[in-house]
């Protein structure tokens, strides 16, 4: 299922971050398998075996992340990031998602956005906010300072991979490893 979002100019469009819902990623994998099987029918069975094995790994990943998310106390299941990339992840795993910016990392971060989100964090007693690998840290650090100015502390819970995979150094060089790493980072900070 594709999620709607409102752009800054009020136009409704679809959230492009489909990969954060494992069910969507399974559909993408199916399209790749079918395309390869059609383009190279001599190896269709090989592609089918790999596709089936990958689906099993995706199902295991989905179950792992759901179990991790359920270990977070319900009142703490709020994911605050720099830009609005995690709506599919939140929808799939039961997290409320808040962001300083919209879906595009090109949009400007306004002081009103930071102030409103700081008020939300204080009111809900949110434990952690998250930086992203593909977005400069300055907006999250500004949010952290805005919360501090209101007499509360909020920690930076770690770095999430939003618009790119990580690398072998961080054990995030594949889709599955990245999804699990994001889940672990979120859970460790919000528990």
Question: Where on the chain are the PLM-derived regions?
Answer:
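Extracytoplasmic metal-acquisition and chelation regions
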Residues: 1-191
């Amino acid at each position: 299922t594709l999620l709607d979002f409102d752009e800054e100019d009020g136009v409704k469009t679809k959230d492009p971050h489909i990969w954060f819902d494992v069910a969507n990623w399974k559909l993408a994998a199916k399209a790749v398998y079918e395309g390869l099987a059609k383009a190279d029918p001599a190896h269709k069975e090989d592609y089918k075996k790999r596709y089936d094995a990958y689906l099993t790994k995706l199902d295991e990943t989905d179950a792992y992340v759901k179990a991790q998310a359920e270990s977070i106390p319900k009142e703490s299941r709020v994911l605050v990031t720099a830009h609005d990339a995690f709506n599919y992840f939140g929808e799939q795993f039961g997290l409320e998602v808040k962001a300083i910016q919209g879906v595009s990392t090109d949009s400007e971060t306004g002081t009103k956005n930071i102030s409103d989100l700081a008020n939300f964090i204080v009111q809900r007693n949110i434990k952690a906010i998250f930086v992203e690998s593909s977005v400069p840290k300055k907006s999250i650090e500004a949010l952290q300072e805005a919360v501090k100015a209101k007499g509360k502390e909020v920690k930076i819970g770690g770095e999430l991979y939003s618009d790119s995979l990580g690398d072998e150094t961080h054990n995030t060089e594949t889709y599955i490893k990245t999804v699990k790493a994001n889940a672990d980072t979120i859970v460790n900070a919000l528990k």
